Amino acid sequence: MAWTKYQLFLAGLMLVTGSINTLSAKWADNFEAEGCGGSQEHSFKHPFVQAVGMFLGEFSCLAAFYLLKCRARRQSDSSVEPRQPFNALLFLPPALCDMTGTSIMYVALNMTSASSFQMLRGAVIIFTGLFSVAFLDRRLVPSQWLGILITIAGLVVVGLADLLSKHDSQHKLSEVITGDLLIIMAQIIIAIQMVLEEKFVYKHNIHPLQAVGIEGFFGFVILSLLLVPMYYIPTASFSGNPRGVLEDALDAFCQVGRQPLIALALLGNISSIAFFNFSGISVTKELSATTRMVLDTLRTVVIWAFTLALGWEVFHPLQILGFLILLMGTALYNGLHRPLLACLSRRWRHPTQEGEQERLLGDSRTPINETS
């Protein structure tokens, strides 16, 4: 069935905004500007400030939800309303996981390439699958276990590509290894978030935009408050800011003031996450979860192509192999092979049936020709 213009628009919006989200965050990391107190130019390494911005973007999804709710009320549509009342504090545990995992990933993005960052996020299906078996009493079919094993192999290949790639002064080998490991660690926390959401939240049939918005609210408020103690926690050279603390929000604002393009990158990150969540949810509703997974895979290709074109990273052939293996593992885990196998079996069956019909017709025609 052909896609409608609206469905094409949603797919394009998801692909574009999802790519902008990662690329804008990496773009901000690449800027250098003076900080507070006349400090020398230094890189914009403020992962927790960026995470606060991302949660602000998620929080804005509540505005989109209430607009949909108002329109639904005018049309007497009750699909937006939850089936039963719920306590908003249900979202606090998954929001804490989201906050922790996102913050770790922004730290990791400072240490590794954007394409590796996007590819290694595929590790989430490994831990989601294992945790769903352990805590949700779910049984994985053999193809899903095979998908997990193939995904592990793909992660190893992507990691090897990072190890063997040429590294500049910005991304040393030790930083790249640490960054890759942090991304894997973050996926464990994100998988816990998904299991918590499925076990305690989704049974209330809450609209996804409302769920994202509430989690964004908790993440924004809590992480904003945590920026205060982070300003005083020493971390030596790990943080990358002049004061050597876990996060220097004041330095971030000073750098933004001296380099307006950083503000543009942050604005792109904040707005893109809101539109990405909206379009992703809409694609799942209008098309399918499989389509959303395919578009997310294409997003990795777009990010990779842009980072290579902009010279942000060096091409390594192993990354192609690793990406293809990850793609195969993700497709198997999500059941994308089933419609493909069904299509192939139909194509295989039809020529065989046609051949059998021809033989039957041929056999039936021969006696007639002979008698005539």
From Swiss-Prot:
Record: glycosylation sites: N110
InterPro entries: SLC35_F1/F2/F6, UCP036436
UniProt key word Endoplasmic reticulum: no
GO terms, biological process: negative regulation of mitochondrial outer membrane permeabilization involved in apoptotic signaling pathway; positive regulation of cell population proliferation
Positions carrying Phosphothreonine: T366
SUPFAM superfamilies: Multidrug resistance efflux transporter EmrE
Sequence similarity: Belongs to the SLC35F solute transporter family.
The protein's name in its UniProt record: Solute carrier family 35 member F6
Domain EamA: 105-160
Bilayer topology annotation: Multi-pass membrane protein
A Pfam match: SLC35F
Signal peptide extent: 1-18
Transmembrane segments: 48-68, 89-109, 116-136, 145-165, 176-196, 211-231, 261-281, 293-312, 320-336
